[in-house]
Swiss-Prot record:
Keyword field: Cytoplasm, Initiation factor, Protein biosynthesis
Assembly notes: Component of the eukaryotic translation initiation factor 3 (eIF-3) complex, which is composed of 13 subunits: eif3a, eif3b, eif3c, eif3d, eif3e, eif3f, eif3g, eif3h, eif3i, eif3j, eif3k, eif3l and eif3m.
Ranges of residues in domain PCI: 180-339
Job description of the protein: Component of the eukaryotic translation initiation factor 3 (eIF-3) complex, which is involved in protein synthesis of a specialized repertoire of mRNAs and, together with other initiation factors, stimulates binding of mRNA and methionyl-tRNAi to the 40S ribosome. The eIF-3 complex specifically targets and initiates translation of a subset of mRNAs involved in cell proliferation.
Pfam name, any one: PCI
Name the UniProt record assigns to this protein: Eukaryotic translation initiation factor 3 subunit M
């Protein structure tokens, strides 16, 4: 049976044709429109739309887009319940099947709505859920700046803000977008206050473990400032994070010897932890010393003499440290190293450097004026 073309008719006639179409597919629905108005008709149509979701993609898209278009012409106060019901149908129906079609329908609804309508939150959550089930997160908007703006535009409650950020984080993790996921998790944890930080205990724990696992994450001091992470002070997970933020390899080795079972329970690789701590330790050494002997590197990083040069090469590849190997003197000459932490002392150093540049530029400027006036 061909699908009716829902165009060039009144909203009431369109609803009646949808009713007739659903009825022909076996839905338990009257072919007569409700006396309660279009929003009642749509509530009944959405409730019965499961039968048409079993059709071919083209047929489903035609009929469901008709439903979407009718929902969008309603007054805002009548849309919310219908949108929630429609999203629930599209998210849950045969979960995992026909994801591209369900994403398309949800996307049509999302982009057809006024940008400031709070009900867009429900649709966006639906988009995230469907995208996560099929690895299609790249096909929906996930830019954190844009998500922040939507959260503000929709005037979301704290609870809903946490829900959407957590959904987005989990979807990005499932879709192997670790860098983006880490940023979203930091945003989520940063939205907690002293009053509700304890509620994010599990999220904070996950955030720390994921950061420690990430082979590209070396600067972790910003995590210590997050209130849910502060709430974990005194626990082993917080102690471990503190070691990765500012301590040396020897501190990690001692921690591991005393808490091997804990490290294993986190799913962390001791060997990977050792590799990361060697680099972090070397970064700290390079900040304080412009010349470092091979012997010192060997001792501090607990590696053999034949491993030093290979380690230096790998360290430079991370772009956390810039240095050259002086094989004659058996030393490393450092030109730059990234600070593991950026606190008051580092801000002062940055201020002093910028101020020096400013003074030098003023001298150059004055010299040029003197030459031009001569």
């Amino acid at each position: 049976m061909s699908v009716p073309a829902f165009i060039d008719v009144t909203e009431e006639d369109q609803a009646a044709e949808l009713r007739a179409y659903l009825k022909s597919k076996g839905a338990e629905i009257s072919e007569e429109n409700s006396e309660g108005g279009l929003h009642i008709d749509l509530a009944q149509i959405i409730e019965a739309c499961d039968v048409c979701l079993k059709d071919d993609d083209k047929d489903v898209e035609s009929s469901m887009n008709s439903v979407v278009s009718l929902v969008l012409i309603l007054e805002t106060d009548k849309q919310e319940a219908l949108i929630e019901s429609l999203c629930e149908k599209l998210v849950k129906f045969r979960e995992g099947e026909r994801p591209s079609l369900r994403l398309q329908l949800l996307s049509n609804l999302f982009h057809g709505m006024d940008k400031s309508i709070p009900a867009r939150y429900t649709v966006y959550c639906g988009l995230i859920k469907v995208a996560a089930t099929c690895g299609a997160i790249i096909y929906i908007p996930t830019d954190l700046d844009q998500v922040r703006k939507w959260i503000s535009d929709w005037n979301l409650s704290t609870e809903k803000k946490h829900i959407v950020l957590r959904l987005l984080y989990e979807a990005l993790v499932d879709c192997k977008k670790s860098d983006e996921a880490a940023k979203v998790m930091v945003e989520l944890l940063g939205s907690y206050t002293d009053d509700n930080a304890s509620q994010a205990r599990l999220d904070a724990h996950k955030c720390i473990v994921r950061a420690l696992k990430d082979p590209k994450a070396f600067l972790l001091d910003h995590l210590l400032a997050l209130k849910p992470v502060k709430f974990l002070e005194g626990e082993l997970i917080h102690d471990l994070l503190t070691i990765f933020v500012s301590a040396k390899l020897s501190s990690y080795v001692k921690f591991y010897q005393n808490n091997k079972d804990f490290i294993d329970s986190l799913g962390l690789s001791h060997e990977q932890n050792m590799e990361k701590m060697r680099l972090l330790t070397f970064m700290g050494m390079a900040v304080d010393n412009k010349e470092i002997s091979f012997d010192t590197i060997q001792q501090e990083l607990q590696i053999g003499a034949d491993e030093v040069e290979a380690f230096i090469i790998d360290a430079v590849k991370t772009k956390m440290v810039y240095c050259k190997i002086d094989q004659t003197q058996k030393r490393v000459v450092v030109s730059h190293s990234t600070h593991r932490t950026f606190g008051k002392q580092q801000w002062q150093q940055l201020y002093d450097t910028l101020n020096t540049w400013k003074q030098n530029l003023n001298k150059v400027k004055n010299s040029l004026y003197s030459i031009s006036d001569a």
